[in-house]
Amino acid sequence: MYKPQFMSIPPGTSLAGKTVLITGGNSGLGLEFARQVLVLNASRMIITVRSQAKGDTAIATLRADPEVRATNPNAKLQYFDLDLDDYESGLEFVRKVYADVSVLDILLCNAGTNFFNYETSMSGHERLMQVNCYTHFLVVLSLLPLLRRTAAKRASPTRVTFLSSYSHVHHTLESNPIAAEESVIAHFDNIKKYVSGKRYQDGKLVINAFVQRLASIVPSSEVIINCVCPGIVATDINQNLPLWIKPLMCVFFMIKARPVTEGGRVLVRAAVVVGEESHGRYLQTGEIHSGASFLCQPAGKQFIEKLWAEIVADIGKINPEVKVFD
């Protein structure tokens, strides 16, 4: 995986008056992104958690940070419950946002996990795809009206940024292609098609594909949608891997990983700094990158269209209020 260069944020960058929402903001990159955004004077910060204890700890950590205390001590900090393993939790989260949030300026889809073996989510899909992709897609599509209304109110675009990874170029869809008559979601749900240790890469490819397709129907003047690789950063993303592989990953991260502060800065650049030129694009080292060539090929374009149609249909069963117009 490519290791990004040091990224700086332009002097004078300010998020005063802005509301920022982060999935999985209680640890790792999400927590660091929250900290840096608060230092940029965001007025309201909402993170998602799966337990009250984690939420309380994260808020206390942010409140106690010396830079936050010095620059933005009066910011409104909150946590909302969200279990990405379950579509229904995603829907309840969306309802909570609409009930409590009148404007939304930045949505960072950061939460994620990694599994080595096949597992099934509470919603019945392969678990990594559910957590890293599908429930996030439900949240984004459901919150689009709020993001668009905020953009109209601000007279400037709002933002949606997904956490991606350079590892998506090592996906399995060329060596293990989806048949023309085969459903994309069914392919990923099929345990016989599951390649241990490779689903994380496939998930990031799915994110890149979704970002491209969503950006094709949402004007960048309303919502800037992109995805970004923060590089190799030491976080707890691999906590669910088998015990035998953890020592190997630990050594790898000790050698290759960069500080979480630098990874967080890359996310801030993608979600705050870069402009409409990043709409629908994958960013690496803080700059626009072509990403996996597969998505530019005929088979990749067919994959994008099939994925989009199936995701919209699947999410529509959970939240019929989602309206997507081509």
Where on the chain are the PLM-derived regions?
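Intracellular terminal tails of multi-pass secondary transporters
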Residues: 1-16, 298-326
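Alpha-helical membrane-targeting segments
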Residues: 1-7, 191-197, 232-262
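Rossmann-fold NAD(P)H-dependent dehydrogenase/reductase core
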Residues: 2-233, 325
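An acidic site on a long C-lobe helix of protein kinase domains
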Residues: 86, 206, 259-262, 303, ...
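Short aromatic-enriched loop/helix-cap "lid" or pocket-rim segments at secondary-structure transitions
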Residues: 92, 172-176, 237-241, 293-297
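Non-transmembrane alpha-helical segments in soluble domains
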Residues: 211-215, 268, 308, 312
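C-terminal/domain-terminus segments
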Residues: 227-229, 233, 284-288, 295
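C-terminal helical subdomain
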Residues: 250-292, 301-303, 313, 317
